[in-house]
């Protein structure tokens, strides 16, 4: 089937922002103006179309990134029809994994900021992730009708705190209650949207006198930024002192695609002002799939790197970036197609797991409705029904042309809780539900505690686990009791050790005999366990090296102080002895494990605790209380800053001290302070804390 929309008219974009910047409302308005949804869903009423999980509507935050396809021809129908695939991303820090996944498969992003609170801590996280994946972006300063809204100030904050070169291509006419519309700095026209028909129509007028000078100044800066797009433009600009509107657009587009600049737009999604102009900017300045770098993958030999161009003629390759459980069709695998064509009914290879998968139905998703399609082409984002063994981050590709597209990296969980089913009936359902949730979300882990038999779930924060337990109840009808949160401590060796590990059982008949000499040394904690052997003269036969390594590795995972995995260790097997008859793999595995236990004292084993990077935003009146409280929690304040949103306090605080912080912070600031927290590093726990944890584990 021929393409309905040529590839150069595709835009795969994400809309990302801080929690309350108005991202879902902005997306809603986009759906409204592109004609997809007839009644605008308001987040305030818990009715937004993109937020389709019950919980999101209750909490008013977006948790799962729903993918939506819309079409747009411009405010004046001035373009050919473009197809815009939008991924709505969550802004809460416990869900950064979702944002990371989405950014991985996008070609461009719209970053929404609140006109009155500006750059908030979460915005920095999202910005860093977008930098990591080199995503070209434009900025939409929303809520210009709010008290304290100031477009210039937000642009300055983005320059200062995010280090981005912001070039405004619009300017606001009035602000707060007097916010009337925006000036298009390229055409130098003032645009006023009609409030009677929810902004569907608008009129253009001359720029109001009171902001004319400021607009001239900004246009000059914008033209200069556009001139840097190419040498020809720069020459013309230097000769004539100006560029045509088309040249300005071409120059700005070059600069945005090269990630040299970020364009600044403004409006109020809630008041229906500025969203259509934002859509025009998406078409005008964000890249089509064939304008971004071709995706690179590794061939089956594990070494050869190959690029796959965004074209229907290349072999099929796609990345599964999200797994979702849908109440009607079961498991949905969202894929971004990078190259080639896929028809429903085709078989593909999951090259990460080396398994063949058959594609059942293919669905084009709107936020909570779906249309069945027969094929997907390069550049498309769609959902497949009925995939068995696909996890987030897997590559799906042509059976004859296997390739592994780059893996996404997922952080290790930092917090765990025990969950117990309330009844026997819940027991079986719980296993199934947890398996499903873990498949959807790679930052969520499930394991069984071998000593207690309890099921332990781990995730990125309290809210993350709350929501997963809540989903278990709603979607899978599993009732469970939740234990107190547990911190994911780790252990490490602080110095080298040279030890024996000897496992001998000889009491007549076939015995067990394994003896090793191992040197342990600390390495960087972020590195994987390293194992070397330097056996000379066959004191330990070659066939037992693997068993020794396995024994050491297993004991490192099990820990020596309090049962937590040991990080940053290199082990060198350099000597030992064996018995012709009694030695076997098991004996050498046990000997390896004993070597780790014996090394604990000599190697100075210590307990490590996770340290979180905490950013609290508070009105000045409560600053003393918030600081004092962070100090009591063993926090080390790293710095403070004044912003539009209030004072920002940056601190490093042990995770174990942060439980219940959200509630405490609310009560000490009468609900006006907020915070974000993400994992920073592991650091040695103070002796009194370590002793408590170790004795707690052993009691």
From Swiss-Prot:
The GO molecular function terms of this record are: GTP binding; GTPase activity; guanosine tetraphosphate binding; translation elongation factor activity
Gene3D superfamilies reported for this sequence: 3.30.230.10, 3.30.70.240, Elongation Factor G (Translational Gtpase), domain 3 (3.30.70.870), P-loop containing nucleotide triphosphate hydrolases (3.40.50.300), Translation factors (2.40.30.10)
| Cellular component GO terms held in the UniProt record | cytoplasm
Please list the GO biological process terms of this entry. ribosome disassembly
User: PROSITE patterns under this entry?
Assistant: G_TR_1, G_TR_2
Q: Which UniProt keywords apply?
A: Cytoplasm, Elongation factor, GTP-binding, Nucleotide-binding, Protein biosynthesis
**Residue intervals of the tr-type G domain:** 8-290
Q: Which domain of life is it from?
A: Bacteria
Q: Which residues bind GTP?
A: 17-24, 88-92, 142-145
InterPro entries found in the cross-reference section: EFG_II, EFG_III, EFG_III/V, EFG_IV, EFG_V, EFG_V-like, EFTu-like_2, G_TR_CS
* Protein's cellular compartments: Cytoplasm
Main location (coarse class): cytoplasm
* Annotated function: Catalyzes the GTP-dependent ribosomal translocation step during translation elongation. During this step, the ribosome changes from the pre-translocational (PRE) to the post-translocational (POST) state as the newly formed A-site-bound peptidyl-tRNA and P-site-bound deacylated tRNA move to the P and E sites, respectively. Catalyzes the coordinated movement of the two tRNA molecules, the mRNA and conformational changes in the ribosome.
Family in the record: Belongs to the TRAFAC class translation factor GTPase superfamily. Classic translation factor GTPase family. EF-G/EF-2 subfamily.
Q: Which HAMAP family does the annotation name?
A: EF_G_EF_2_B
Annotated PANTHER family: RIBOSOME-RELEASING FACTOR 2, MITOCHONDRIAL, TRANSLATION ELONGATION FACTOR G-RELATED
Instruction: Output this protein's name.
Output: Elongation factor G
């Amino acid at each position: 089937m021929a393409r309905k929309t040529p590839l150069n008219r595709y835009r795969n974009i994400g809309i990302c922002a801080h929690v309350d910047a108005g991202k879902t409302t902005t997306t809603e308005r986009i759906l409204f103006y592109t004609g997809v949804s007839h009644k605008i869903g308001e987040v305030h009423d818990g009715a937004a179309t993109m937020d389709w999980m019950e919980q999101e509507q209750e909490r008013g935050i977006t948790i799962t990134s729903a993918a939506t396809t819309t079409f747009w021809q411009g405010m004046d129908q001035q373009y050919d029809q473009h197809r815009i695939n939008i991924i709505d991303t969550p802004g809460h820090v416990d869900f950064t994994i979702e944002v990371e996944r989405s950014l991985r498969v996008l070609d461009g992003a719209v970053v929404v900021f609140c006109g009155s609170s500006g750059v908030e801590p979460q915005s920095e996280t999202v910005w860093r992730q977008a930098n990591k994946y080199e995503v070209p972006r434009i900025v939409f300063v929303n809520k210009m009708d709010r008290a304290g809204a100031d477009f210039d100030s937000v642009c300055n904050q983005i320059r200062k705190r995010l280090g981005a070169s912001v070039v405004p291509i619009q300017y606001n006419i009035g602000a707060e209650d007097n916010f009337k519309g925006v000036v298009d700095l390229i055409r130098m026209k003032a645009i006023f949207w009609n409030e009677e028909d929810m902004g569907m129509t608008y009129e253009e007028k001359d720029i109001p006198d009171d902001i004319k000078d400021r607009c001239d100044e900004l246009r000059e800066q914008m033209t200069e930024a556009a001139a840097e797009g190419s040498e020809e433009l720069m020459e013309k600009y230097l000769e004539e002192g100006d560029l045509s509107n088309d040249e300005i657009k071409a120059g700005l587009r070059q600069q945005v695609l090269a990630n040299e600049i970020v364009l600044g737009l403004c409006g109020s999604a809630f008041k229906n002002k500025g969203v259509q102009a934002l859509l025009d900017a998406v078409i005008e300045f964000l890249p089509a799939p064939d304008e971004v770098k071709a995706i690179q993958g590794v061939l089956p030999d594990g070494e050869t790197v190959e690029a796959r161009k965004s074209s229907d003629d290349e072999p099929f390759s796609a990345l599964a970036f999200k797994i979702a459980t849908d109440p009607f069709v079961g498991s949905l695998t969202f894929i971004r197609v990078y190259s080639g064509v896929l028809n429903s009914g085709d078989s593909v290879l999951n090259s990460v797991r080396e398994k063949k998968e058959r594609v059942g139905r293919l669905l084009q998703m709107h936020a909570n409705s779906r249309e069945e399609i027969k094929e997907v082409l390069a550049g498309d984002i769609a959902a497949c029904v009925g995939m068995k063994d696909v996890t987030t981050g897997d590559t799906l590709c042509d059976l004859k042309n296997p390739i592994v597209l780059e893996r996404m990296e997922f952080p290790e969980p930092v917090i765990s809780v025990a969950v117990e089913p309330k009844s026997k009936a819940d027991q079986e359902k719980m296993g199934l539900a947890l398996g499903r949730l873990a498949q959807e979300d790679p930052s969520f882990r499930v394991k069984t505690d071998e000593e207690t038999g309890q099921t332990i779930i781990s995730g990125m924060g309290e809210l993350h686990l709350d929501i997963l337990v809540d989903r278990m109840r709603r979607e899978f009808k599993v009732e469970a009791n939740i234990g107190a949160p547990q911190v994911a401590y780790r252990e490490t060796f602080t110095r080298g050790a040279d030890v024996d590990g000897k496992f001998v059982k000889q009491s007549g008949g076939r015995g067990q005999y394994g003896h090793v000499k191992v040197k342990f040394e600390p390495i960087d904690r972020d590195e994987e366990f390293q194992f070397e052997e330097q056996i000379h003269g066959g004191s330990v036969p070659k066939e037992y090296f693997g068993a020794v390594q396995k024994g050491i590795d297993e004991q490192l995972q099990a820990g020596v102080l309090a049962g937590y995995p040991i990080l940053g260790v290199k082990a060198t097997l350099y000597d030992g002895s064996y018995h012709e008859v009694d030695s076997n793999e098991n004996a050498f595995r046990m000997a390896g494990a004993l070597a780790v236990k014996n090394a604990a004292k000599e190697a100075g084993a210590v307990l490590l605790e996770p340290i979180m990077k905490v950013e609290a935003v508070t009105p000045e009146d409560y600053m003393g209380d918030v600081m004092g409280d962070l100090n009591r929690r063993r926090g080390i304040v790293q710095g403070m800053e004044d912003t539009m949103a209030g004072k920002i306090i940056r601190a490093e605080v042990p995770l174990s001290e942060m439980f219940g912080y959200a509630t405490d912070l609310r009560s000490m600031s009468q609900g006006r302070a907020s915070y974000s927290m993400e994992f920073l590093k592991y650091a040695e726990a103070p002796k009194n804390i370590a002793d408590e944890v170790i004795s707690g584990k052993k009691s």
